[in-house]
Amino acid sequence: MTARDPTRVPATLEDLLAIPEEQRRHELIEGAIEEKGSATSEHGDAQHSLSAFTFAFKHEPGGRWPGGWWFGTEVEVHFDPANTFRPDVTGWRRDRVAERPRGTPVRIRPDWVCEILSTNRRNDLVRKKRVYHRFGVPHYWIIDPAEETLSVLRWSQDGYVEILAAERGETVRAEPFEAMPLQVGIFFGDDEKDEAPAQEG
């Protein structure tokens, strides 16, 4: 782990937003501006497939699909003066957030965040994870394209608890979206199969 320079002046949200929007693939993490890892085709495919899966949840509840959520992809979310992130996919429950979050950065704490690991995986697994926990994000998913795995984490007082670990080839029900079976392989290039049985996670 790289040592932090105690004399460094912390960056601010204003410093982050000063980067031109079309060039801003950056995050403010613990007072430092860091560029997100380069998006590989595997990362992009996983992100696209996750957005397709969550489509069933993005409407008002009570219709054909479960609904009940707002979602955003690469939305800037502000937590505190030292931390503004761009999670790969972010969700807010409609029963808590009446209107779709707008503007940038969004200042409403998410109910669910998913990060897809890339070259800066330490940020997702350690530093950003600590912030998500500190601000009470209830659900945290981690998709690892290299290992072809999905980790589903649930908030607890002492830290996130992994309640489900799944790999390519498995079909699971993963909270908070357990109303729909999830074929994990769709994140890693597999076509969705109608006949796949679901196992409880």
Label every model-predicted segment.
Residues 1-201:
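Gly/Pro/Ser/Thr-rich low-complexity, intrinsically disordered segments predominantly at protein N-termini
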